[in-house]
Amino acid sequence: MSKFRFTIKVLAIATFMFATVSIAQAQASRTWVSGVGDDVNPCSRTAPCKTWAGAISKTAACGEIDALDPGGFGAVTITKSITLDGTGTFASILASLVNGIVINAASTDVVTIRGISINGFCNGINGINILQAKTVNVEDCVIFRFNTGNGITVNETNDLNLNVRNTVIRDNTLDGINTVTSGAANKINVTLDNVRLSGNANGLHARSGSRVTAQNCVFSNNTTNGIFSDAAGANFSNVFVKDSQISLNGANGVRAGNAGNVGISGATINQNMIDRNTSNGVLVSTGGVVNTFTNNSIIGNGTDGCPGCTGVGPGN
């Protein structure tokens, strides 16, 4: 009997070790999705999966999921460091009645979304909804037609870095990018480079805890403000913009209020063009501060100039 029990224990240990090894082997560093794939596959290049969600469980933390060919690869929730890359294909997400991508990872995780078209189908919630991560990189993407939320939403309780580059965020019912942290001492650091925000309510809505730097961007044809910096309580919102176009918005090109702080700078030789906005080129609301260099062009707006602004830099 004791020999039988010993044999059973050995078999149980062997089974556990085999299962552990199998799970480890299933977590590949690089996996693949395809429009003709199947999520029962191992997500290898020769046997790809069908969806991001199907591949993510088979991809190790810090790994990468690549799109082999054009396809709609479905909404996905990300809970670890990972890269989704659709570069060179027409990789897309059709997010009807849901968020396109939800990021709820550890506060030490880095997530990269690259080369993906994210379509809200006129009833989606948010294009990318960021709840927690250390850093989120959005590169070479198009995010559009989310009618109950924002193109990119950040609602974070910890510090977070958001880097958006070479991306179009358009035609969303609420904001193109909306950032806020609920932690009084926390901050969201946002870098925008060559980002086009158009056809939203506010192109950029930087709320409490937001620290934004934007360059070579376009904030145009939004129904309210091109850029809106506002905050509540002691946690300020700061936006620094240079070498950008802020035009044809339904209310103001730039608005700062509710303890918001916007620094509109043309740096040394570059300019911001703030023109043809319906109400004001620049509006300083209660509690707001706008610092402006002299090399911004503020013309053709309902109200031009920069009343209430503080001049900084050369020539002031």
Residue locations for each model-derived region?
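Bacterial N-terminal signal peptides
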Residues: 10-20
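Acidic Gly/Asp/Thr-rich repetitive segments characteristic of extracellular carbohydrate-active
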Residues: 35-74
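Right-handed parallel beta-helix
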Residues: 88, 109-120, 134-146, 159-174, ...
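Sec/Tat signal peptide C-region and signal peptidase I cleavage site
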Residues: 21-26
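Extracellular beta-strand solenoids
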Residues: 67, 78, 86, 103-105, ...
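Extracellular beta-strand-rich solenoid/capping regions of secreted or surface-exposed proteins
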Residues: 60, 73-85, 92-135, 148-157
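Bacterial N-terminal signal peptides that target proteins for export
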Residues: 2-12
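Extracellular beta-strand/beta-solenoid scaffold signature
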Residues: 95-104, 121-130, 146-156, 171-186, ...
